[in-house]
Amino acid sequence: MRMILTAFLINFTTQAVAGETALAGTVTHVRDGDTIEVNNVPIRLAALDCPERGTQEGDTASKIAQQFLGSQAKCELTGATTYDRLVGYCEINDTDFGRYMMQNSACKVWEKYDVWNRY
């Protein structure tokens, strides 16, 4: 029952902010190198393609992203969604998170999804 309620709340929260263009708050969870949660809302970083967890490069990217847990984030949402995640470009502690991950890990720009030509 607790898991059902948690899933409902996450889905409801995601739907509630899906129409918004920005989200600001605390990084509450890091799923992997290109997906974080801000105020428990999952955000898929636009234009960022990181290796998957379970690979050496993916685990390293996740570990690098973990250092931002508890930091303040400001995300510009593109209006797109993927699975349970909103898609957006985020700054964490006034640093472009996508650019930081590309400079410090094996993450690369995914040009097809760089909808605002940031990278």
Regions found by a protein language model. Give the residues of each.
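Small beta-barrel nucleic-acid-binding modules, primarily SNase/OB-fold domains
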Residues: 2, 11-119
